[in-house]
């Protein structure tokens, strides 16, 4: 806020000063500088009784753009903005500097006044006497322009970010709508087959062997879980990454949980003739984690491993009691791997490698995995598979015995 001595002046009502000597005093709210500012103001007030000059007092906390405009590094600071050249006094001895410079400033003022008198006959095209360009009002306008420019820049960035988020959500929703058709159709066919062959009078399936009934039920359940994951992904996109991730940790057998997820994905990796190798020790301790959240992590990592491993390739799963406090779980594949430069970025929300733009997926799986693992005070990272491909590792706390 600009102040004329002790009088407050509104930003939208700037002062138009014609005083030959114009000064700005920059102050802040620090208690340590309060006494120094009072001494400077008292000295300037004494000078005003004898000399004609305009003094504006500026609080840098309320007008940071003016401080930026003058490139100030310390306060209090006294600036002579008119007549030119501009001079800045700062430090603990402002009054001493002012006493030394005041005669020169008055000499400059006398020269300026004499020059103005000589220019009275020189007018501009509108019949007005030319005014000095470096005035208190022009400084306030410059500071306001700096502030508005900053705001416009920030608003443009926010707009671009929001547009990017909206475009991403539109793309994900369109992909989900398309992808939901396959599991919905498969589940519907399985259920309709079971329904059309079920005789409620005898409580049995006709013309269907027990093994086929079990297979159809498994297929319907698997497709329902696929749909559930897609809906969870859609909800995650809608919520964004700024919402708090709620977890309900409990004693969890991560090895057993992983085998359950593998069973749900069996049709996918057997269709590609992929081999699954597991190295999960029987004495691997339970972890303290939210089983549904960790299921999401396992589904995402195994889904990626199946997706990127070629037909006939190998998917590896390993558990390791890394320390007395942590269990490490790892999932490896024999796919194309992750370039070294991208191993941090792949965990960013919406980020996808250029080579994967044509593949199915929404660019939120690994980001969600990282959020879940971090919510459990664990770590997740990726490195190279010695035989080609990638290894994803994550840690979880051991359940206290």
Curated annotation (Swiss-Prot):
On the tree of life, the source organism's domain of life is Bacteria
Q: Which SMART domains match?
A: HATPase_c, HisKA, KaiB
Q: What class of enzyme is it?
A: transferase
Q: Which InterPro entries match?
A: HATPase_C_sf (IPR036890), His_kinase_dom (IPR005467), HisK_dim/P_dom (IPR003661), HisK_dim/P_sf (IPR036097), KaiB_domain (IPR011649), Kinase_SasA (IPR023527), Sensor_HK_Regulatory (IPR050736), Sig_transdc_His_kin-like_C (IPR004358)
A biological process (GO) annotation for this entry? Answer: circadian rhythm
Q: Name one Pfam family in it.
A: KaiB
Keyword Hydrolase carried by entry: no
Recorded hits in Gene3D superfamilies, A to Z, give: 1.10.287.130, Glutaredoxin, Histidine kinase-like ATPase, C-terminal domain
What keywords would UniProt list here? ATP-binding, Biological rhythms, Kinase, Nucleotide-binding, Phosphoprotein, Transferase, Two-component regulatory system
For this UniProt entry, the molecular function terms from Gene Ontology, in alphabetical order, are: ATP binding; phosphorelay sensor kinase activity
Where, per the database record, does this protein carry Phosphohistidine?
Answer: 178
Q: Which reaction does it catalyse?
A: ATP + protein L-histidine = ADP + protein N-phospho-L-histidine
| Residue ranges constituting the Histidine kinase domain according to the UniProt record | 175-400
Catalytic activity, EC: 2.7.13.3
Query: Its function?
Result: Member of the two-component regulatory system SasA/RpaA involved in genome-wide circadian gene expression. One of several clock output pathways. Participates in the Kai clock protein complex, the main circadian regulator in cyanobacteria, via its interaction with KaiC. KaiC enhances the autophosphorylation activity of SasA, which then transfers its phosphate group to RpaA to activate it. In addition to its output function, recruits fold-shifted KaiB (KaiB(fs)) to KaiC to cooperatively form the KaiB(6):KaiC(6) complex (independent of SasA kinase activity).
Subunit info?
A: Homooligomerizes. Interacts with KaiC. Participates in the KaiABC clock complex, whose core is composed of a KaiC homohexamer, 6 KaiB and up to 6 KaiA dimers. SasA and KaiB(fs) compete to bind to KaiC.
Domain-level remarks? The N-terminus interacts with KaiC, while the C-terminal histidine kinase domain autophosphorylates and is probably responsible for self-oligomerization. The N-terminal domain stimulates the C-terminus to autophosphorylate.
Can you say what this protein is called?
Answer: Adaptive-response sensory kinase SasA
Q: Which organism is it from?
A: Trichormus variabilis (strain ATCC 29413 / PCC 7937)
What does the organism's lineage look like at the top?
Bacteria, Bacillati, Cyanobacteriota, Cyanophyceae, Nostocales
């Amino acid at each position: 806020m600009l102040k004329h001595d002790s009088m407050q002046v509104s930003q939208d009502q700037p002062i138009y000063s014609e005083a030959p000597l114009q000064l700005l005093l920059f102050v802040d709210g620090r208690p340590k500088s309060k006494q120094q500012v009072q001494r400077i103001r008292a000295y300037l007030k004494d000078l005003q009784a004898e000399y004609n000059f305009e003094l504006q007092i500026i609080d840098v906390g309320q007008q940071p753009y003016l401080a930026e405009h003058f490139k100030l590094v310390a306060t209090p600071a006294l600036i002579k903005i008119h007549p030119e050249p501009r001079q800045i006094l700062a430090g603990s001895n402002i009054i001493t500097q002012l006493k030394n410079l005041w005669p020169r400033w008055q000499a400059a003022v006398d020269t300026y006044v004499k020059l103005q008198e000589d220019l009275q006959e020189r007018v501009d095209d509108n019949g007005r006497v030319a005014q000095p360009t470096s005035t208190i009002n022009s400084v306030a306008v410059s500071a306001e322009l700096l502030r508005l420019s900053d705001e416009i820049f920030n608003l443009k960035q926010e707009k671009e970010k929001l547009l990017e988020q909206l475009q991403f959500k539109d793309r994900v929703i369109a992909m989900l709508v398309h992808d939901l058709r396959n599991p919905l159709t498969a589940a519907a066919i399985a259920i309709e087959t079971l329904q059309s062959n079920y005789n409620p009078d005898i409580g049995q399936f006709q013309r269907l062997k027990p093994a086929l009934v079990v297979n159809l039920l498994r297929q319907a359940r698997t497709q329902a879980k696929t749909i559930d994951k897609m809906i969870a992904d859609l909800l995650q996109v809608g919520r964004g990454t700024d919402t708090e991730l709620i977890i309900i940790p409990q004693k969890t057998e991560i090895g057993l949980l992983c085998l359950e997820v593998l069973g749900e994905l069996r049709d996918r990796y057997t269709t590609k003739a992929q081999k699954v190798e597991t190295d999960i020790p029987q004495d691997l301790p339970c972890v303290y984690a939210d089983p549904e959240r960790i299921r999401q992590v396992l589904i995402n990592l195994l889904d990626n491993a199946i997706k990127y491993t070629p037909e006939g390739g190998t998917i590896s799963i390993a558990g390791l009691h890394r320390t007395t406090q942590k269990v490490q779980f790892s999932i490896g594949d024999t796919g194309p791997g992750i370039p070294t430069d991208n191993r941090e970025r792949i965990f960013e929300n919406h980020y996808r490698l250029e080579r994967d733009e044509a593949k199915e997926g929404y660019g939120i799986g690994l980001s969600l995995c990282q959020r879940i693992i971090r919510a459990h005070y664990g770590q997740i990272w990726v490195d190279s598979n010695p035989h080609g491909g990638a290894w994803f590792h994550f840690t979880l706390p051991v359940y206290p015995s």
